[in-house]
């Protein structure tokens, strides 16, 4: 698949000028004639690089404030012309072959992300000539090289040096794929932006002129990893990441050691990391099958880990551990000496901790970096034939948001524990019940079809591990439809309940709490998780 083509003439027109002077200089030193436009041509000329303005080559000036620069047959004919087939036509019309196109596009995404961006600003940053040249060159990759990414500049020069100033068909094809990916992403961003400017469908409020959800939903992801298999061994799988993933995520984490992350590893690590981000104090979250099985705070992460592990040592076996502070050697030692673990993730990992974990070479050790903001954007769930798209669940309550609805007022400690286990319940699969005391989970009931059984399971798990439920707080991710969940909690020893409220039978549920001498707190916010 060699079919090398020499590079004799290149057209360069870039918005992002990172590395372009050095690249153009390298091309010129290798005898490549350079065509260019506007600001790119001026920059190259200022740096002493011989350059021909496209307008001089075509005999047609740039016009309309730069809107029309490269849209000319002498440009596109030179790019699209098939070598050996269109040569006579090109010669007849004075069209020179263009062997390489170096283009990146107007910064549309950066423009619309700016505060105060107007529709007029956005429109002026829609590139027309650029995508046209990119697609033309990519279509004719049999003869023409297209370069859209600055990180490919060195690769191109290296191959030219190794291949008598030529590039192979394999390289041209690979660069063409990158070009089509680039224009697809660009057009998708534009469609998304304009698509939010139409009224919402369905539940549209009166006067709502725009929707945050575009008419068509375009997102592009890049394959980061092929996997041995998916959720089950008979399923093929791969891991894709966003073009610009957010800080401190499983997608951006650096793997320090261990086997390749599996499909389930990635899903569970994401659940653990997003949960531990909720806490400012030293915290540890242990996750198994996407559910927290132990969460705790401590004076340091070692204490937090010891307490989180104490919740459910059985389920912690083969789990995922996440911290919100640097992993130190003492904590790493406690983990590897105590239990089998799949993944450990922390914002940073000390050199000493790396050395400790290295003794268990299969343990996947990840460093995700610090986070400064909450995760934003959309949650997407695939259904057969469609997507469910929603805001991420960023909702959380503070002390001032709580409404005590029982006769008994919660104590200061109960309020503190209520806020702690409410944060945990947000990350437990519905129906979710969490028992907690002293900034430590005591029992977790997850994923049951009836809320009362989740409450019973939380109590059973606490009893199995010898943990004292009496005096604990219970959090429920949604309201109690009946009083039976409160009765089950009281039987286990729960003294305070935090829940959204909003049931048709709230009065019965509150009455049950009063009968048992419980404090009951309403948050007014639900945290279903499916």
UniProtKB/Swiss-Prot annotation:
Its EC number is 2.1.2.3, 3.5.4.10. GO terms for cellular component: cytosol. Keywords: Hydrolase, Multifunctional enzyme, Purine biosynthesis, Transferase. Residues 1-148 form the MGS-like domain. InterPro entries: AICAR_Tfase_dup_dom_sf, Cytidine_deaminase-like, MGS-like_dom, MGS-like_dom_sf, PurH-like. One of its GO terms (molecular function) is phosphoribosylaminoimidazolecarboxamide formyltransferase activity. PROSITE patterns: MGS. It catalyses: (6R)-10-formyltetrahydrofolate + 5-amino-1-(5-phospho-beta-D-ribosyl)imidazole-4-carboxamide = 5-formamido-1-(5-phospho-D-ribosyl)imidazole-4-carboxamide + (6S)-5,6,7,8-tetrahydrofolate; IMP + H2O = 5-formamido-1-(5-phospho-D-ribosyl)imidazole-4-carboxamide. The keyword Magnesium does not apply. The keyword Acyltransferase does not apply. Pathway: Purine metabolism; IMP biosynthesis via de novo pathway; 5-formamido-1-(5-phospho-D-ribosyl)imidazole-4-carboxamide from 5-amino-1-(5-phospho-D-ribosyl)imidazole-4-carboxamide (10-formyl THF route): step 1/1; Purine metabolism; IMP biosynthesis via de novo pathway; IMP from 5-formamido-1-(5-phospho-D-ribosyl)imidazole-4-carboxamide: step 1/1. It holds the Pfam family MGS. One of its GO terms (biological process) is 'de novo' IMP biosynthetic process. Belongs to the PurH family. The IMP cyclohydrolase activity resides in the N-terminal region. This is Bifunctional purine biosynthesis protein PurH. It comes from Vibrio campbellii (strain ATCC BAA-1116).
